[in-house]
Amino acid sequence: MITRDFFLFLSKSGFLNKMARNWGSRVAAGKIIGGNDFNSSIPTIRQLNSQGLSVTVDHLGEFVNSAEVARERTEECIQTIATIADQELNSHVSLKMTSLGLDIDMDLVYENMTKILQTAEKHKIMVTIDMEDEVRCQKTLDIFKDFRKKYEHVSTVLQAYLYRTEKDIDDLDSLNPFLRLVKGAYKESEKVAFPEKSDVDENYKKIIRKQLLNGHYTAIATHDDKMIDFTKQLAKEHGIANDKFEFQMLYGMRSQTQLSLVKEGYNMRVYLPYGEDWYGYFMRRLAERPSNIAFAFKGMTKK
């Protein structure tokens, strides 16, 4: 049986990542990523929008280790936001704090995020601060808290597999946060994360319930039918309008389900990554649900 740990191991292989960069983008583009850069992803965004699907784009690549590259990523993100507005695309932007220099200098991150959010506020484009591994969780939340007090168009992500997440929701409540709720895709110690899938699922339900009943806009990012049905039933029982939450799924996975949710009247947003560093992202996604492997590779290779 192919396990979650196997895919997480593969995601960290430098050799396989290099191979994927050399030849894989041709296979991945249009299947699991939008393209090698943002401009090449615009036709895909337009196609998704025409089907009633919203989008959030993410320039793949993290763990930047130079201030110069972090500033380049910042300028690229600013240009992406401006292009989204200019092209009238229905899209948010997602980004990781390590791509802006989190592992280099906190002042650099704040400098870069300030520039990005000033542009986002001007164009009314939501910027989602992606969550990474647990060791960076607190710093990421501190950054979100500081900027949420100043800017409207900023959101972040919480992971159900971490023990701390329910308390994090309570701590963020006063900020009226827009949160994307996910199960979690990084390999973590049992000291900080639930080791059993059943416990992760129960905690996921718990945080979905808490965030929605707190009255805050919520993105439920899942491909799990049980979680989708749970959210629908919760909304029905408590009279939560469809415009108070959205579902999110990955580009290239469960496309028909995405369209079905739109037809049912739900908000549906597609997470559309782009860039050459797609391999680690893809392996972590398979680690979330190893049962997706046949479906995923079929989607990558079919015409």
From Swiss-Prot:
Cofactor entry: FAD
Intrachain S-S bonds: none
Gene3D superfamilies cross-referenced by the UniProt entry: 3.20.20.220
PANTHER family in the record: PROLINE DEHYDROGENASE 1, MITOCHONDRIAL, PROLINE OXIDASE
Entry protein name: Proline dehydrogenase 2
GO-annotated biological processes: proline catabolic process; proline catabolic process to glutamate
Keyword Ribonucleoprotein: no
Entry superkingdom: Bacteria
Family label: Belongs to the proline dehydrogenase family.
UniProt-annotated binding residues for substrate: 96, 284-285
Disruption phenotype: Deletion of the putBCP operon abolishes L-proline utilization.
Protein function: Converts proline to delta-1-pyrroline-5-carboxylate. Important for the use of proline as a sole carbon and energy source or a sole nitrogen source.
Binding positions (FAD): 131, 159, 183-185, 222-223
InterPro entries xrefs: FAD-linked_oxidoreductase-like, PRODH_bac_arc, Proline_DH_dom, Proline_oxidase
Catalysis performed (reactions): L-proline + a quinone = (S)-1-pyrroline-5-carboxylate + a quinol + H(+)
A GO MF term: FAD binding
Species for this entry: Bacillus subtilis (strain 168)
